Design a protein with these regions (language model features):
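Alpha-helical scaffold segments in soluble metabolic enzymes
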Residues: 12-16, 75, 79, 111, ...
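A short, N-terminal amphipathic alpha-helix
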Residues: 72-83, 119
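Glycine-rich anion/phosphate-binding loops
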Residues: 27-29, 60-77, 99-110
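Short Gly/Ser/Thr- and Asp/Glu-enriched loop/turn motifs at secondary-structure junctions
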Residues: 31-33, 76, 87, 134
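Residue-level signal for inorganic ion chemistry
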Residues: 37, 76, 84, 123, ...
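Arginine residue identity/basic-tract feature
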Residues: 7, 42, 74, 149-153
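Glycine-rich anion-binding loops of enzyme active sites
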Residues: 46, 53, 88-161
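Extreme N-terminal cap/leader segments of soluble proteins
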Residues: 1-67, 83, 92, 114-115, ...
Length: 161
């Protein structure tokens, strides 16, 4: 990995790698605003699930970036599915140490792009920052479900499929 000096600025990274992931949703405002909008269908409720992956805890430093991206997205999407919901989009937060290269970030964005297409979702917004600690990636999946129909963990019983 290269150092942060060889990486584009935060705003250039967003423009080059992440705005393309947000183009299909008008509410994402091409990531130029601090908030995104998302309509929920009449008679539905919104679902949210957030997960964080930390280098050295949830993945190894040499794991392929595209696979880390897919893991990050899928752990939150699986929570929505377990609740009976349909995914609509996601928010992404990246805390990047200086040794993360632009090539690593390109591969990470490509992994997100692949899964976005498969799950018919889009990036809605997020945050990027630098850190002196480990690479830390957080994702909040956003979905919807008919009002009152969310499947809760507290309602599970032995033998449920």
């Amino acid at each position: 990995m290269n150092d942060a000096k060889n990486r584009p600025s935060e705003f250039d990274l967003i423009e080059e790698l992440f705005v393309p992931l947000a183009k299909s949703h008008a509410g994402a405002a091409e990531l130029k605003d601090d908030c995104a909008t998302l309509s929920v269908s009449r008679g539905y409720e919104a679902l949210y699930s957030m997960d964080t992956l930390v280098e050295g805890v949830h993945f190894f430093k040499d794991d392929p970036a595209n696979l880390i991206a897919k893991k990050l997205l899928r752990v939150s999407l699986s929570d929505l599915a377990a609740s009976g919901g349909v995914p609509k989009g996601y928010l992404l937060a990246l805390s990047l140490p200086a040794d993360i290269s632009y090539e690593w970030l390109q591969s990470f964005a490509a992994g997100l792009s692949d899964d976005q297409a498969g799950y018919n979702i889009t990036l809605l917004g997020g945050d990027t920052t630098s850190t002196t600690g480990s690479l830390t990636l957080s994702l909040t999946a956003v979905g919807e479900i008919p009002a009152g129909r969310a499947i809760r963990r507290s309602g599970a019983v032995v033998g449920d499929d």
